[in-house]
């Protein structure tokens, strides 16, 4: 049953709540449990919707863990979706992470640019721009997701220097043919 609700066994690699430390030099920090969409391939369905933002105390424990483990050079902010956290709180979390000298890379795993493109605002971009280098790992699974609004939001992120990558999930009947993948 545990592998059904937690198929990647993330809970087994959590030295502190909401922080997965599976690989020596990187961690996954879950900062909230809200998503703009529930993906059929989600490996964290057990968490989605339970209280939204992770508590400040839990985040403090995660950030302190990163600070105290100098082998960690890369953090992936995830959740839920980090971009559903209010701007002020996201700014605070990024400032804390960026203050850690040995942390070289901050990645944000998000579906917001493709599912809630109106969230990509000038204010959000001004916050993100302060914390370079930042990298976005997004999910786009079909070319129809790339609407004009989505393209505008992605362009705003690219214009402030954020590299944008897509973690495309191969889905039967959706994108499992070469023509669709080529177009995507």
Tell where the protein language model's regions lie, with residue ranges.
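N-terminal [4Fe-4S]-dependent radical SAM core
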Residues: 1-28, 46
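N-terminal start-of-chain detector that recognizes signal peptides
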Residues: 2-4, 49, 107-111
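Generic, ordered loop/turn and secondary-structure boundary motif
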Residues: 9, 20-24, 36, 49, ...
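Domain-level signature for proteins that mediate thiol-based redox and metal-cofactor handling
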Residues: 18, 52-53, 67
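Canonical Radical SAM [4Fe-4S] cluster-binding loop centered on the CxxxCxxC motif
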Residues: 22-54, 108
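Conserved AdoMet/S-adenosylmethionine-binding subsite of the radical SAM
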Residues: 60-74, 83-184
